[in-house]
Amino acid sequence: MSVLRSAVTAAAGLALSLPSPALAGGGVSISSYGQRALLIQGGGQSVLLNPYKAVGCAAGMPEPRLTAGVVLANSELADEGASDIAGGRFLAQPGSYRIGGLSLEGFASPHDRMGGRRFGNATIWRWQQGGLSFAHLGATAGELTAADRVLLGNPDVLIIGVGGGSKIYNAEEAAAVVNQLNPKRVIPVQYVNGDAPEGCDQEGVQPFLDAMGGTAVRRLGRSQTLPGLSLIHI
């Protein structure tokens, strides 16, 4: 597995082009707007993940005021899933949804390491877009159950929080989930660049890269076309 590290900060945004090996003319482009806010475009659809208000660990960041066909959030906390920031069909609750040709499945997962007793449940997501399968675990610290692993499968693209703290996987936990799901591509999210804002309990991405152990690190530019290999995109 290769590790690709971007010189572009999360606030500046990272744009990726992911071709689909399974669908001629398929694939998606992914743009980062910091924290775990990603805009995924492809297959005639657009999906925005986790728009946030500039509070908590997102303090000082530009809010992603965008419009997409579907807006997915792991929770409705202001710094994770602010429904009034972005335009589009907003989904944050578990369930099966079909919107504009997209089939999306949301599953409840503990937001914390106490079975949800402290912060309740988050929603983890899976869907197909542009010939690629996605799993979005951007805001959970709960251990995956055997049923979760079956439902999520082996996604082409895994989006996972890695910055630690009370509601996000830490580096070792995130690396364990990557090994469990064995995705083709990994996009780590929800980590800080530079000094953490006051009161933010998250760290940077380097501990996650270290936890992945012995993988090569390559720096990306602002945009990149990527082959269908096992990669980590930052």
PLM segments and residue spans:
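Bacterial N-terminal signal peptides
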Residues: T9-L18
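Sec/Tat signal peptide C-region and signal peptidase I cleavage site
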Residues: S20-A24
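Short N-terminal segments immediately surrounding and downstream of signal-peptide cleavage
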Residues: G26-Q41
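Active-site-proximal loop/helix segments of hydrolase catalytic cores
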Residues: R113-L181
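Histidine/acidic-residue-rich catalytic or RNA/ligand-binding cores of hydrolases
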Residues: A171-A175, A196-F208
